[in-house]
């Protein structure tokens, strides 16, 4: 039985934490374009908590959005060659030999990450699981 004026749980709009940028990113290693996911930051998504002794910010969970992990959006990962870097490093690579080495190691990176994170996907919205996989990819890339 439905009550008029009361929305069912499935009818409610899903709360957005991120969006896909209109501008495509160009991978400096394989020269292919891919989508970039950017975290939305307003409306109480990130409630800054205390700093730890290591000066790391703890983010408090909000009632509306729950626990947020903003650090998973700092890494960019190309879904074509599995190159992952900080977004600030995801520009033109000056050393062409390094870019060729990164490209030749792409399958090795994918297999290494797949053994630890077997269900990671670089095409969907990021979860904590996918964010950890991207950090591991970045570790293997650098």
Task: Tell where the protein language model's regions lie, with residue ranges.
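N-terminal cysteine/histidine-rich coordination modules
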Residues: 1-103
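Extended interfacial segments that mediate partner engagement and assembly in macromolecular machines
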Residues: 91-92, 96, 100-142
